[in-house]
Amino acid sequence: SSAASDVYKRQEPTYGLLRSIGRDFKMLVSPFSGQRHAFWPMVQKFGYEKACAYRDLFHMEGMDVMRFSLKEVVTMINDFKERFVCDYDEYEILACHQANKLIISNLARKIKFPLSKIPLSIVDYGNTGCASIPLAICEHYSNKNTSQDSGKILTCGFGIGLSLGIVGITVEPQNCFPVFRVKERYDDGLSFEDYK
């Protein structure tokens, strides 16, 4: 699931909905990551290489995840719209999790939100997981010459757990820094061999 932090003092309220469909968690799961199966106890039990293999396991039932995205996320967005009596015209963009382009375009079609108002950072960066929402927001404002003080946007995240959420926020475009690309990468000099 994707998250973004936008911390500043504002007078406008923030509206949102959060949901979890825990019974279907096995559709999209990283079964041996996180606190449920801590890494070092797995090393002690299985050895380092097997623990690394377990930690890196990821399972996704693709068609079920697609159905979840196009059913549950659509339902949640429609519930948000109804509960908070809002219109899509109020929002500059819908910054949603960049799972894949097919999900995004079908989601836009189903909720009748203009695809032109959904930044597609997935095209340049791929699925960046929890960074995809703030990346989409920053890409949108860095590609737009704006002097506006604020912009209303919808953010929508969904994914592992099967968790999903939508929040309507007001951002200050001048605080959305441009994304820049570098060719270099930092090499910390560490290797897995150092920790066996």
Regions found by a protein language model. Name each.
Residues 13-49:
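Mobile, glycine-enriched helix-loop/loop "lid" segments at the mouths of ligand-binding/catalytic clefts
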Residues 10-12, 177:
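Beta-strand initiation motifs
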